[in-house]
Amino acid sequence: MTRRILLLILLSLFAACLLSCTPQTTVPIGTVNFTRPGESRQDTLLLFLPGLRDNSGVYADEGFVAAAGRSGIKADMIGVDAHLAYYLEKKFLKRLKEDVIDPAKRKGYRKIWLVGISLGGFGALWYDIENPGDLTGIVALSPYLGDPEMVDEVSRAGGLAAWHPLAGGDLDDQHRIWRGLKSYERRESCAGRVYLGYGLQDKFATPDGMLAAVLPPEQVFTIEGGHHWPVWRTLWDDMLKSRVFDKDGKD
């Protein structure tokens, strides 16, 4: 009992420290426009969601924006400052929709894609699950998909296809998200619009692999490597070469 109490105290202190080090949420959520001044607006918009310790400008810093430009893709690109506090305070979905995606639609964007790494990949999948039909598609690189207990539950069941959430009662957030991921078993919900990439030695390779198993194989990109930017840059280049953003959300 004493050890359990000590563990709870340590977890509380860790959470308090994490919150104190995390930027505050704002209304509207912050963004950074990667489009060069004077360039005409495109019909396609790529929205980049940062990872746990990153900021909205990281995709420019790490070469993603430049690589997209070199690929010839015709798209405007915006980084969204969706840091950890938005998730912890349960503001992520509301702020992304009301401050970024709905205004983008009003401006006339015909195709809107979310691109996210790690925590951002989780955010992209979560938004797509909770707002069906809002997005043209998503790219999730090494997405975080929940705590080890949740992942173990799905794994013990034999994977996402064999796993079923308990019937009756309210599901917690993690079970709701995995139930949403399970919906990608239906080809019409993911074909040509849900793309997954991860390193085979990534710390999230097990849950990402279970998601990969229900997606069309041509929409899954893997290489050797771990949870690092060099891996993600290579996966991004591979996806750009495959012209994933030309699919228009169709296979």
Locate each region found by the language model.
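Non-catalytic cap/lid and distal C-terminal segments of serine-dependent acyl enzymes
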Residues: 22-251
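Bacterial N-terminal signal peptides that target proteins for export
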Residues: 1-9
